[in-house]
């Protein structure tokens, strides 16, 4: 939380000369009572402003000296958008079915709610986890288990000529190099994402927001074969 400098103006009562020290010997009782009643209110207002101060726009993407993206820390505390299971954009069956959990920074999420667009330094993290069907009392369906890796999408027009860049992390990887321009992820998002380079068509809480601002590409919601 960004701190706010808060100051209380010094009150000079009628019985005081400038620079004099306030004491019960120099001021009448009513002045002492007035000070005692107003001081707590002033300090309470200061603490209220501090508590209501907006959080700093963080976390933002961080990079090492080589320009590699650092693994986003505490991304599980970000805004959860949606989860998929066994999603595959190709007609061919995937080699492994897994859960994909999508997170975005809370400040970026709020910007989208307010303006219908993703600001620079927005980062999406796709948390990829193994799926299991047998365990504990479960009899049907699947549940999530171990982390398999992270896929990260970053919007940064100052760093990326194409605005959006894509990164892949192993389960325990700490840095990742941006995928080359023209990579498959970029091409797929560019051709099929409903809002900018993001698959808002799969995020039920954001679809109505995008439609309200007129930025939702309805055609991208239609069933089609990804190429």
Give the location of each predicted region:
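Short, Lys/Arg-enriched N-terminal segments with co-localized hydrophobic residues
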Residues: 16-32
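Bacterial N-terminal signal peptides
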Residues: 36-48
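Bacterial Sec-dependent signal peptides at the C-terminal "C-region" and cleavage site
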Residues: 47-57
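Sequence context surrounding c-type heme c attachment/ligation sites in exported
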Residues: 55-57, 61-64, 71-79, 83-88, ...
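N-terminal post-signal-peptidase region of extra-cytosolic proteins
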Residues: 98-113, 136-138
């Amino acid at each position: 939380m960004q701190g706010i400098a808060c100051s209380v103006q010094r009150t000079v009562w009628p019985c005081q000369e400038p620079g004099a020290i306030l004491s019960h010997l120099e001021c009448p009782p009513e002045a002492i009572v007035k000070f005692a009643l107003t001081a707590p209110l002033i300090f309470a207002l200061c603490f209220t402003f501090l508590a209501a101060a907006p959080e700093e726009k963080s976390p933002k993407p961080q990079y090492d000296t080589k320009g590699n993206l650092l693994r986003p820390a505490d991304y599980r505390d970000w805004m959860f958008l949606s989860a998929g299971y066994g999603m595959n954009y190709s007609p061919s069956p995937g080699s492994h079915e897994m859960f994909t959990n999508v997170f975005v920074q809370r400040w970026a999420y709020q910007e989208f709610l307010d303006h219908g667009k993703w600001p620079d330094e927005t980062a999406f993290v796709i948390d990829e986890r193994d799926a299991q069907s047998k365990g504990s009392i479960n009899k049907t369906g699947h549940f999530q288990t171990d982390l398999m890796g992270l896929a990260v999408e970053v919007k940064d027009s100052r760093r990326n000529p194409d605005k959006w860049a894509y990164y892949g992390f192993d389960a325990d990887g700490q840095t990742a190099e941006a995928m080359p321009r023209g990579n498959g992820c970029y091409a797929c998002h560019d051709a099929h994402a409903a809002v900018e380079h993001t698959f808002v068509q799969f995020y039920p809480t954001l679809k109505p927001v995008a439609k309200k601002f007129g930025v939702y590409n309805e055609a991208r919601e239609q069933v089609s074969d990804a190429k």
